[in-house]
Swiss-Prot record:
Organism of provenance: Shewanella sediminis (strain HAW-EB3)
Residue sites binding a divalent metal cation per the record: 98, 108, 147, 177
Renumbered residue ranges of the record's region Important for dimerization: 242-277
Site positions (Important for dimerization): 177
Protein name: Oxygen-dependent coproporphyrinogen-III oxidase
Gene giving rise to this polypeptide: hemF
Length: 306
């Protein structure tokens, strides 16, 4: 298996963070990202870049982190006993975008690299990541385009790649206590190393580079759609699902908290405003009801199974 080039991965991730921030600033037209660099006592650090109160984006956070440690945390070794007793290095770019307009979906993307070392043994390494979309008032054309872009970037790596990682995304971003998906999915992959370093790195780069080209057209199409208090209230209510998932189920959040990561950066994904409502039920045949009946469940958006 080819030897991992951690410096090349880090260089790509830093460049990706810069390009995504520049692209989001262009889409917003008003807001700018403030950079906040930090160091981790146990080793490593990163830079959090946050845009708040923009014209289009209520809050957008794009975080780069590169942390090292003497021992893998419990969240990483729970199902992988071979990692116990190894030092680790983890780096990645993670982002969450919360738009102002309820007709614009929230989105999340992440690309990451882990390597665990032990004297006298080969390193254990893998790539992970993906991107997903969380609409409040979904438009089928947006969802289909989102999945078509995900499908197309996977094609050079094999016919089975998109269906596999699309299914994994549906399964991962699922809230069992609500019996619904967090959104309409996209791609999710982890433990990627079986094709060697170069090929695995190429795929991670394709996912990272494919995020903004998939999200930008949706932003341009929906950012000026008129909305009222009813739509805003529903958006804030649905944002609650984002909070529930991230604090209860998300492995990245748990990993960050268990490794002494920077809390502000880890919780950067939280929406700036959110509301809960007891026993909420959408009005029958409403746009809000359509989200529940037609979108918050796994679906073959590209009709590949026909």
């Amino acid at each position: 298996m080819s030897v991992p080039d951690t410096s090349a991965v880090k260089a790509f991730l830093l460049d990706l963070q810069q390009r995504i921030c520049e692209g989001l600033e262009q889409l917003d037209g008003k807001g700018t990202f403030e950079a906040d660099s930090w160091k981790r006592e146990e080793g490593g650090g990163g830079t959090s870049r946050v845009l708040t109160n923009g014209k289009v984006f209520e809050q957008a956070g794009v975080n780069f982190s590169h942390v090292t440690g003497a021992a893998m945390p419990a969240s990483a070794t729970a199902n992988r006993s071979e990692l116990e007793g190894r030092s680790f290095e983890a780096m990645g770019v993670s982002l969450v975008i919360h738009p102002k307009n309820p007709f614009l979906p929230t989105t999340h993307a992440n690309v990451r690299f882990f390597i665990a070392k032990k004297e006298g043994a080969d390193p254990v390494w893998w790539f992970g990541g993906g991107f997903d979309l969380t609409p409040y008032y979904p438009f089928e054309e947006d969802v289909i385009e989102w999945h078509q872009n995900a499908h197309d970037l996977c094609q050079p790596f094999g016919e089975s790649v998109y269906p596999k990682y699309k299914k994994w995304c549906d399964e991962y971003f699922f809230l069992p206590h609500r019996n619904e998906t967090r959104g309409v999915g996209g791609l999710f992959f982890d433990d990627l190393n079986q094709d060697g370093f170069e090929k695995s790195f190429e795929f991670m780069q394709a996912v990272g580079n494919g995020f903004l080209t998939s999200y930008a057209p949706i932003v341009e199409r929906r950012k000026d759609t008129e909305y009222g208090e009813k739509e805003r209230e529903f958006q804030l209510y649905r944002r609650g699902r984002y909070v529930e998932f991230n604090l209860v189920y998300d492995r990245g959040t748990l990993f960050g908290l268990q490794t002494g990561g920077r809390t502000e950066s880890i919780l950067m994904s939280m929406p700036p405003l959110v509301r809960w409502q007891y026993a909420y039920t959408p009005e029958e045949n409403s746009a809000e009801a359509l989200l529940y009946t037609d979108f918050l469940k796994p679906k073959d958006w590209l009709n590949l199974d026909e």
